[in-house]
Amino acid sequence: MHGLLLAGLLALPMNVLAHPAEHHASNVLSRRGVDIDSFRLPLKAKYMDNEAAAEKIQALSFTKDDDYVSTATKLVKSTFPKSTFRVVDDHYIGTNGIGHVHFKQTAHGLDIDNSDFNVNIDRDGKVFSFGNSFFTGEIPKENPMVKRAFSDPVKALKGAVKALSLPVKSDNAKAKNVAGKETVEFMGTSGALSAPKAKLVYLQKDDGTLALTWRVETDVGENWLLSYVDANNSETVHNVVDYVASAEYKVFAWGLNDPTEGNPTSIRDPWTDASPYTWNSDGNTKYPTTRGNNAIAQDNPTGGSQYLNNYRPQSPNLIFSYPWSATATPPSSYKDFSITQLFYTTNRFHDLLYSFGFNEAAGNFQVNNGNKGGRGNDFAIVNAQDGSGTNNANFATPPDGQPGRMRMYNWTTARPNRDGCLEAGIVIHEYAHGLSNRLCGGPANSACLNALESGGMGEGWGDFYATAIRLKPRDTKNTNYSMGAWAANNPKGIRAYLYSTSLQTNPYMYTSVNSLREVHQIGTVWASMLYELMWALIEAHGNTYSANPVFRNGVPQDGRHLAMKLVMDGMALQPCNPNFVQARDAIIDADRALTNSANKCTIWKAFAKRGLGYGAKYDSRNRTGSNQLPPGC
């Protein structure tokens, strides 16, 4: 099958945008007078890197007959012999040969929802590294299921609606039991995009105790929330997780970052082996429009939740060639071009990430997984010119098996207004939220980047991939990049500092996080470190500037793609809701697994330059910086 796509920003350069660092995110909850950050989950995770894990497991007994799940289970049992837990059904073996197994702690048969254990098993069947946030306090003696010592879930729904000012009408709500212990779906409501749900779970609190809660799930479009409502006092909401990663971007793109960097060109059959059905088929149906196995792209001028019957360009011969002009106005006048561009960028990034290991088993976004593992029926729903907002974009990442949802907005920062779909960097940044949320904590758990610091890293990963993809052959380590300059109509972009290896141009250090209270600010610090890492690896291995990496024994042969691969592998190794130190250690472990630590000192030097060296320590209020290198470097 042949397809001809006319894409305005086709070589895929990348930038990610958000409002200036001094501005706080203005998501829908905050516009309703609710500070979502005040409900974030606390950081609880610990991470045992490869070196520490090797010492820890010497006393443990494993047999050659153990498969990687059994080995991981033995480790959890030996570490917490008095705890009960279950194996989460999302384990898989990554392309680097590391097996990833995830566990959820339980009490009285109920999940402790923020108590997770992840174990990474190497090619030889040995424990490679692990992390956990298991609860170590006293489990309540009484089983709440015996005396039914908890409130009606309808009260919990109403409590969440009231406390968070949700646009959900729940006066006539009724709870209907569905599969799972104390799991319900609410009938008779309106205002949410799908029927709200609730599940009875325990929650670790900051004071070291457990709270019995109803985990109320409400998808209201701009926010897709898990609200932990106290099961005995429905007016108390302990914590909130938001599946939607939102930013005040001012936009981005691949090879070409935005319309200032080139002109639209026609590209024939751009898919790779990552898309065996091509981009316009799911293996069962061939679509003469911007729909396929990986994504479905359409306009959404009303900002509504429906998408299947929305407008898409049609082309029976699969030639998607449409006019565009920088002076055209309004953006709806070139919606065919915009939808095609969004479809192209989303699919192109899907294929690149697949080559790094974000495949079916790892929880990627596809309808048809071709019997390769994971849960299917979850392509990315990507809306162009979405009318639910302006000067923004967001991506909702539910667990594997449910579609991701991207909303791309128009920008009123210039005349004529600009369309965020034409900056691939924004699209890439948003899709990267799907990547990090599916990998961190496992494909079945989308709540592992909701603490302030881990959420900040989620923003930073988006910036990193957007910037790495937009590099040009003329670039050197002295090249600086802004974020969202085109969409923001501001040459300085939307971050507090340019991404730069110069400490004069970008002075952010690890200890800078001590004074930052917003995820995009923290994300800029993390992305600044990853920018250092990328250039350090480019200096060591060169840069092909090719659109696709060249692998040898599974290792990208240039520094830019190697950095992207190691950063992604680190996401799958680190614990649920990691901090900077743990994420750094996971990247170092990723290099050990992939290259036998060939880049260990290069990686350490990059992080140490910005204060995340060997002696750096995490404390939520007083992080300690270090420029030290470990022995041997």
Swiss-Prot record:
Binds 1 zinc ion per subunit. Coiled coil: none annotated. Glycans are attached at N232, N410, N480, N622. One of its GO terms (cellular component) is extracellular region. One of its GO terms (molecular function) is zinc ion binding. Keywords: Glycoprotein, Hydrolase, Metal-binding, Metalloprotease, Protease, Secreted, Signal, Zinc, Zymogen. Residues 19-246 form a propeptide. SUPFAM superfamilies: Metalloproteases ('zincins'), catalytic domain (SSF55486). InterPro entries: FTP_domain, Fungal_virulence_M36, Peptidase_M36, Peptidase_M4/M1_CTD_sf. Its EC number is 3.4.24.-. One of its GO terms (biological process) is proteolysis. Its cofactor is Zn(2+). It holds the Pfam family Peptidase_M36. The active site is at E430. It is found in: Secreted. Residues 1-18 form the signal peptide. Zn(2+) binds at H429, H433. Belongs to the peptidase M36 family. Secreted metalloproteinase that allows assimilation of proteinaceous substrates and probably acts as a virulence factor. This is Extracellular metalloproteinase 3. It comes from Arthroderma gypseum (strain ATCC MYA-4604 / CBS 118893).
